[in-house]
Amino acid sequence: MKHIRNFSIIAHIDHGKSTLSDRLIQECGGLSDREMAAQVLDSMDLERERGITIKAQSVTLDYKAKDGETYQLNFIDTPGHVDFSYEVSRSLAACEGALLVVDAGQGVEAQTLANCYTALDMDLDVVPVLNKIDLPQADPERVAEEIEDIVGIEAADAVRCSAKTGLGISDVLETIVAQIPPPEGDPEAPLQALIIDSWFDSYLGVVSLVRIKHGVLKKGDKFKVMSTGQTHTADRVGIFTPKQTDTAQLSTGEVGFVIAGIKEIHGAPVGDTLTLAKNGADKPLPGFKKVKPQVYAGVFPISTDDYENFRDALNKLSLNDASLFFEPETSSALGFGFRIGYLGLLHMEIIQERLEREYNLDLITTAPTVVYEVVTTKGETIYVDNPSDLPPMNNIEEMREPIVETNILVPKEYLGNVITLCIEKRGVQTNMVYHGNQVAITYDMPMAEVVMDFFDRLKSTSRGYASLEYNFKRFEAADMVRLDVLINGDRVDALAMILHKANVRYQGLALVNKMKELIPRQMFDIAIQAAVGSQIIARSSVKALRKDVTAKCYGGDVSRKKKLLQKQKEGKKRMKQVGNVEVPQEAFLAVLKINE
């Protein structure tokens, strides 16, 4: 056991986590040169296209150290985006240490800090690594100072390496062996294994990635899942060397997979504990805290026949993605679908793309909303995540919106732009500290403003240098109203949104003008109105197509023309009473893109 090292790789987006893991695999001979590909561990097509890591992946390598001993390294490559931070905290729960990778050119960024604090909260040993030292703009001395100054961990003798060229990789491995402690645990005790991750394989059933805390799990053992009490037989156990490799047993301190032919999808939830069916452990391991979704959106299949497939797809995805929350929803405009809770807008995009790709579905998404706390006049407190569930305005005593604490790290020269942006987003500054060339600013900001497009705008005002991480702080009373869209006097429930009173006129106008371009012209006028309660605040109309009925009149009496025009007018009026307007899919997406 003293030859096992479990660690995660944490870093900000694009500081080279996945490339570093490639080099570690190559150095330890996990894969032959022929099988090696860039970013081996980003196995999803989507991850490769976007160049980001979405799922944490685990690998077991054997490393022969300079002291002549062979060490087993279990490491987990984690995502860097703030939307996937729960993936990071899950991976850290399975480790004794973490490699904090920092780009020697960019320096410390917000996500570096957030992930590092998560690791320190869990009492892990954090080993700083300066990556990309082959770049001409790399300045390892300055960055090492920054790490000590901002993060507060010893970094004078931080390992320097370049994952791209492979320089200094052996030093990284030696440091891991020297500085990260071996796992603690009792091989003789009853089995306790923590499920770090599970996914559904259509041939094997549920595959679970586990970390053995105490005891041993052998192939063929009968084990039970502690939350459900169901027993299963371990058909196969093994490790990833990135390839799936079967072994006879997983012993204390190891990280590996278990396949037990579990067919029902929620048979082995993430964060659960496995123990042996006979004389097992009495109490489960502390799991992970449940992450609460921050953003909700309605998602509907375009053809109603897909509803069943859509439900199965969501079930399979939620096994793999523990933070996904969904419940059925119906809309008069879009039919049957689900209300899905996400961790942020990137998460929302990724989930929608995965559903469309991996399960061949065509989906429409409504505008995302955050959760509001509403106090009714009867004194009840309710939580609303769907604009159509909002009680009428005269029954609401007060509405409170979620406020998040955002920590932004930005180079001095872009500070002005960033502050202007934060004020525009109704932010209140609570703190500001200078660290060398960087400034750390803290704002309290409405979550609704942060999740919409704050991240993209922050990146563009600071040329990509500013970085951000945020967490929920409290609910605060605010002047929020519901904006409804009426088409020919009918409310379209899927287009409603909850906005701040100050923005509502501007947003309403922008929305009706955008809709006007997207709704196809009919044979009658279509009135598009934006309303707050019973008050109409903006209107635009899609003009009718009309036939030139007087073209055939040549000369003659004017009353003849009048008669034809009058007849056309009556026809249009009749059509307007019976005609209904199809709202095209682009119009629903217009709500998301008002601000552009």
From Swiss-Prot:
The keyword Translocase does not apply. It is a peripheral membrane protein. GO terms for biological process: positive regulation of translation. GTP binds at residues 14-19, 131-134. Its main location: membrane. It is an enzyme of class 3 (hydrolase). GO terms for cellular component: plasma membrane. InterPro entries: EF-4 (IPR006297), EFG_III/V (IPR035647), EFG_V-like (IPR000640), EFTu-like_2 (IPR004161), G_TR_CS (IPR031157), LepA_C_sf (IPR038363), LepA_CTD (IPR013842), LepA_IV (IPR035654). The keyword Cell inner membrane applies. Keywords: Cell inner membrane, Cell membrane, GTP-binding, Hydrolase, Membrane, Nucleotide-binding, Protein biosynthesis. HAMAP family: LepA. Belongs to the TRAFAC class translation factor GTPase superfamily. Classic translation factor GTPase family. LepA subfamily. This is Elongation factor 4. It comes from Shewanella loihica (strain ATCC BAA-1088 / PV-4). The gene is lepA.
